[in-house]
């Protein structure tokens, strides 16, 4: 008995420590000097967000964004979140994931293709205080992601418009906020320009199970699977995930600010025993009145006795890129660096880079980023020209999987931590960010760095949909995303699209912004063949190389394949009524079973036909 209690206590202590470690990681991912405007609803934040359909309001943004504007009739809102998430929370619509609630024929949740964009165009609003510690400084409002377009109003002033799902926006609100008093933030959010429909395409190859509906969703730079795909609801998410889907925060700087630090590593071969580091950072002078400011940027690689500095001048309104090269600063040549390795190949060694900018000896701003020193390359020097990856010169056998976002963007750090921990435990070492999904959070990439999980990043184009009609908007979203994620050693490879082509200028832009990672035009070229199988087959077929009718799958690089798996009965009961569980209600099961494949019901039918009904 004593040993049992001792063992039980040890297990509980281990679980507690795991939860505590996860929470510490989540806290580390957030800058404590910022004000994070997370909603009370769902996220347990400190801010009361409200929402109202724009068509139900006649008042202009100048009035809605004043601190005394009445919102008693508005609904509580989830931020970060989507319009539909908030409407479901407020019980305006049923839970989409239950039974056939989301099925377009059920007519329980209006689809944007039928009711129009105005139906899901909403105002989101909250109030916040700016602390006295921000007095005399530049105050910034940072918006990390809104789908799809937005007007940003503060205290009666329209300060910015946002375009595209993956843009980070930094707004100087210094002249528009009141220190120590209530301030109002109102954001009018518009859905994607072209919502598309679930009707099959009238052009080109229809694609398996009509993925992407009529294909028009691809005219936007957004999460393409929201219109429907064969691994989720075939008829899509009703609002196309309209909303403030990522964080909003407020922070302060001095006269100048730092943004987008980047550190490049060039390793000496063949021994990988020396690293030449090149550091760069953007310095912003937001003033429109002064003639220029003399600045000094100081940097250090924390704990390594490596520091460097440079003085320069930034004129008013300038955004200046400041670079520190190892030729100019020999201390940026690191001997015997601690290399970063993927899981099961070595330790995930990480360094911290800290940069500060000062004017007249007063620190105005500081940024900190983590990085790893490693080299990831690939080639097709194999008998069948299949792509092979190398990390620090060592050949790596890829055990990968596609990473598909939760369809309604109900994300949380807790969920991200759990899913990535399970991913590592399963033996996976590479995650493909599929092109119809999203660019994941900073916390996601931080965990991939720590867990040794490589990331293959695609950029929101597929062969099942049309291509973005606004090239400049698409490229600005790519640029914003690359600047955000490029310091992560886990980021291994760029791919422009899923089974399609590239936007002209993409490889040149990636090389300009990064230049340290491989690239290919789409997911099925340059040593990577097409996917499948997408169902369970006799395991021997894999060894015999006959698993897929499309050809060889053993001696090549397969970008995607899949098979159905059944959740536990407890989870199934959260998805449907008891009466639909058994005997199987084919309509319900098919709708929840990836919809395009129906493999669970098909497999059951095949088994019954072969073996007879279960007794």
Where do the PLM segments sit?
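Secreted/periplasmic carbohydrate-active enzymes, especially glycoside hydrolases
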Residues: 1-11, 21-434, 439, 554
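General structural signal for secondary-structure boundaries
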Residues: 25, 80, 199-203, 412-416, ...
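Short amphipathic alpha-helical segments at helix-loop
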Residues: 109, 183, 466, 614-615
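C-terminal substrate/ligand-recognition segments
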Residues: 393, 608-615
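Substrate-binding/catalytic cleft of secreted carbohydrate-active enzymes
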Residues: 430-603, 607-610
